[in-house]
Curated annotation (Swiss-Prot):
GO CC field: chloroplast thylakoid membrane; proton-transporting ATP synthase complex; proton-transporting two-sector ATPase complex, proton-transporting domain
Lineage of the species this protein comes from: Eukaryota, Viridiplantae, Streptophyta, Zygnematophyceae, Zygnematophycidae
Marked site positions, Reversibly protonated during proton transport: E61
Family of the protein in this entry: Belongs to the ATPase C chain family.
Protein name from the UniProt record: ATP synthase subunit c, chloroplastic
Keyword Cell inner membrane: no
Other remarks in the entry: In plastids the F-type ATPase is also known as CF(1)CF(0).
The gene coding this protein: atpH
């Protein structure tokens, strides 16, 4: 394998995971903060808010997992070789 392609693939894999986790990380923090605020305002709606929060957190985390899949594909099944 060409060392330049190998080095670029490792850098791209690191960037894929890093950049793919920035947006969901910010979104998860904002969603959790808003959920806590909503529960503080309406404690009787805690179950509904928590269920919606967990579902939305799972969808946000899926974006990070997609970045991990791209990184693993670049490292172990490199299409540029």
């Amino acid at each position: 394998m060409n060392p330049v392609i190998s080095a670029a693939s490792v850098i791209a894999a690191g960037l894929a995971v890093g950049l793919a986790s920035i947006g969901p990380g910010i979104g998860q923090g904002t969603a959790a903060g808003q959920a806590v605020e909503g529960i503080a305002r309406q404690p009787e709606a805690e179950g509904k808010i928590r269920g919606t929060l967990l579902l939305s957190l799972a969808f946000m985390e899926a974006l990070t997992i997609y970045g991990l899949v791209v990184a693993l594909a670049l490292l172990f099944a490199n299409p540029f070789v």
